[in-house]
Structures are given as structure tokens and as C-alpha cells.
A protein has these predicted regions:
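Helix-loop junction hotspots and adjacent acidic micro-motifs that serve as functional foci
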Residues: 1-403
């Protein structure tokens, strides 16, 4: 995001109010924190996300989560985690406000951590996995990890022309959808893509997290259509490429989302190169605001086994020790409601003689390889193990939301 693209007046007011709210909370102490305090930070989180301030938004999300735990006297509340992310939120809000007031474009872009946005006329994708974060009385967030695919007719024709062997496109070309690839990252077949959505959760609104996926979006689609194993076409959308090379999709008022045919060629995506990950780590230059998860990358883990040791528990996660390629990976699953479905799926996978391929997000924490599993790859495609498949009563959902 560029500074000139922002509503600087509105953004400055929001950032200054956020900084003041944090300062007031620190001056008066946590004992004065209430549901209203949680709502203030939660509204700031939603506004930051809508404004495209991804780094501030993700930081506020964690601070809101811990503050909610404190006000509800939840045993998993972590004072260390809360103070870290609250302090980080204050630093980012003050820094961004200062950059806006001084018209410092370079500093603004560094703190927002956003890449330039590219308009895309048409983009056909499939979903490999979904991460879910649910904080009662605050929000429910989903992040869909996808790959770009060729339209069905073109994909079949290309396969026949190449003797049944797919040929990867080169960067700097124009693809069949009319999207021009550039040296900075063309939107070509196989490109990693993300689309995320956040839903506010009202106090005492006891709904299954997955029920929010059935709510209509502004573009007249429901997010559930992304997890039915079918092609989905985004029209008149926007893509911003992160430093990792992953593209983040955003939608405008004129954007469209259409579900297509069932997708079957899932096995083509199952690959991961540890060597490439090592190269990225060697080229990485750390900064004072960086987090471990900002170095995360999508991985496929094959031929893994459970190590013969008990599960380990932290403040917020259950840790499954896995053996992979002679090394160790810690697979972490939330202890909360948002991790219940994955815990059941992972327990089932551990018990199987032939372990399924795991798709997930890996980052490096305290010299450990840490994996957040998202799905298991089967013959018919991914099993979205983070999401419950229980039937949603749409009438009850709309009634609960007063829609």
C-alpha cells in the first residue's frame, strides 16, 4: 500500500486513538479492562485490516485475543504474550502516525509491510488449506491458502500438446487470462495465493466458527464455496505480492467470485524444497519488529512418523513431535475451540499405518522447525482438517445475527 492511496485523515485519527487507548490501559492498569476495552481494540483491529495495515492488524489480533482471555479470567491468559503484542501495537501505531504526518512514504511502506497492488482481470484458483482463528466475543478469521490453475479447457489442451506432461510457464510472459507476468512475480499457474476474511463476533454470540463461512459477502458469494474441492474464479480482483513471493488477493466492490467444476489434479502441487527454504533464511535480514511467523512458508510433509514421546503442552498449543527426513518437526495445534477439529484429525492420522501427506505452514521458533498443519492430502484432494464439517443451520445462523 502506498501512502498516497490512503485516507490519511481517517487513518491518522484511528492510529492516534489506538495509541491513546493503549496508553490509558497501561496507566490505569489491567484491572480496569472491561468488555468495552476489548471492543475498542477489536474495532481498531478490524479497521486496520480493512485499511490494509496487515502488520498492525495481525498484531492487534493477538493483543485482543489475550485481553479477552484476561477479562474472562481464562486460565490460558499469558501476561508475557499480551504485553509483547500490546507494546508492538503501540510502536506500530505511533510510527505509522508519525510517517503519515511527515509524509514519509518509505517509512510508511516499511511499517505497513505491504507490497504494491496489481489489478487482475481473472484468476482461477483451488484451495489447499485453511487456517482458522476464533476468539469469543471478538472475531473469527479465516485464511485460505490457494494455487492458481489454468482454466479447465486450456489445462487439458496444454497437457495433450505436451504429451501429457505439464510445462511450467516462464516469468515475464502473458498468461491465458490476460494477466501479464513480470520479473517481480507474474500470476502464472502454480502461483501461491492467499485470501483472508475476518468476521466480528458479538458478545454472547455462541455460533460455530465455520458457520460464518455461510454468510454472504459484499461480492454476493459465500466463503464456503472455496472449500468444496472446486475451481473458483476471482474476477476484477487485486493481488499484492509479499517478499516470500506469495500473492495476497483482495476484492473490491466490482469484484466477482464464481465457483466452477470439480478439480482433480491435486497431486501436482505436492512438493517442497528445503534447499530453497535455506536460501531464503540465509538471505533474510532481521528487523526489530519481525516475528518468527513472518518467515513462515507453505510446506508438504511426506513420509513422517510420530516420535515415541508424549505430547507436550504450552500456554496455547498442544505439540505433536514428528520425525521427518531424520530430523524433528514440532506440529502445533491450538488448545482452544479453534483447534478441536484439527486435534481430532491429527490423532486419527497418527494412528494410521500409512501417514497422509500434511500441508501446512512452517516457521522457525527457538531453533525448532514448527509446523501448523492445515490439511491432509488424499486421493480426492485436501481434507480441510481445521474446519468442522458439521451441518450448519442457516436459519438459526441468520436469526442469531439478526439478518
Amino acid at each position: 500500500m502506498k501512502l498516497e492511496q490512503c485516507d490519511t485523515k481517517k487513518l491518522t485519527v484511528m492510529l492516534d486513538q489506538l495509541a491513546s487507548a493503549i496508553e490509558e490501559l497501561l496507566l490505569t492498569g489491567l484491572t480496569t479492562a472491561s468488555d468495552a476495552t476489548v471492543q475498542t481494540l477489536n474495532i481498531s483491529f478490524q479497521e486496520a485490516s480493512r485499511a490494509g495495515l496487515l502488520r498492525l492488524g495481525s498484531t492487534l489480533r493477538v493483543a485482543c485475543e489475550e485481553l479477552t482471555r484476561y477479562t474472562k479470567e481464562h486460565p490460558d491468559f499469558s501476561a508475557k504474550r499480551f504485553s509483547f503484542f500490546l507494546n508492538r501495537s503501540w510502536l506500530l501505531s505511533k510510527g505509522l502516525s508519525k510517517a503519515i504526518k511527515e509524509s514519509d512514504r518509505e517509512e510508511f511502506e516499511r511499517l505497513t509491510w505491504n507490497a504494491p497492488v496489481t489489478p487482475v482481470r481473472q484468476l482461477e484458483v483451488v484451495t489447499l488449506g485453511v487456517s482458522k482463528k476464533y476468539v469469543p466475543n471478538a472475531f473469527c478469521a479465516f485464511e485460505f491458502r490457494m494455487r492458481r490453475v489454468e482454466p479447465a479447457g486450456v489445462e487439458a489442451a496444454a497437457s495433450v500438446a505436451n504429451g501429457g506432461v505439464e510445462e511450467s510457464g516462464a516469468r515475464g510472459t502473458t498468461d491465458v487470462a490476460g494477466n501479464t507476468g513480470t520479473a517481480g512475480g507474474g500470476i502464472l499457474p502454480g502461483q501461491k495465493l492467499i485470501w483472508s476474511v475476518v468476521f466480528p463476533v458479538k458478545p454472547n454470540q455462541n455460533l460455530p466458527p465455520e458457520s460464518f463461512l455461510h454468510l454472504p459477502q459484499k461480492q454476493k458469494f459465500i466463503a464456503y464455496c472455496l472449500i468444496e474441492g472446486r475451481r473458483v474464479t476471482f474476477g476484477d480482483a487485486f493481488v499484492a505480492f509479499e517478499k516470500s513471493g506469495t500473492g495476497r488477493i483482495s476484492l473490491g466492490d466490482k469484484s466477482t467470485v464464481m465457483q466452477g467444476d470439480e478439480y482433480t489434479d491435486w497431486s501436482k502441487f505436492i512438493s517442497w524444497s528445503p534447499e530453497a527454504a535455506i536460501d531464503r533464511l540465509n538471505a533474510y535480514e532481521p528487523g526489530p519488529l519481525d516475528l518468527e511467523i513472518e518467515l513462515q512458508e507453505e510446506v508438504f510433509i511426506e513420509d513422517w512418523e510420530m516420535l515415541p514421546e508424549p505430547l507436550r503442552e504450552t500456554e496455547s498449543h498442544i505439540v505433536y513431535p514428528l520425525s521427518y527426513r531424520g530430523g524433528r518437526i514440532d506440529a502445533v495445534v491450538s488448545r482452544g475451540l479453534d483447534g478441536a477439529t484439527m486435534r481430532a484429525a491429527l490423532d486419527k492420522a497418527v494412528a494410521q499405518k500409512k501417514k497422509p501427506v500434511v500441508f501446512g505452514l512452517m516457521h522457525y521458533e527457538k531453533c525448532r522447525l514448527t509446523l501448523q498443519p492445515l490439511s491432509f492430502m488424499g486421493k480426492k484432494g485436501p481434507e480441510y482438517a481445521t474446519l468442522s464439517r458439521d451441518k450448519v443451520d442457516r436459519v438459526a445462523l441468520l436469526k442469531a445475527l439478526n439478518l
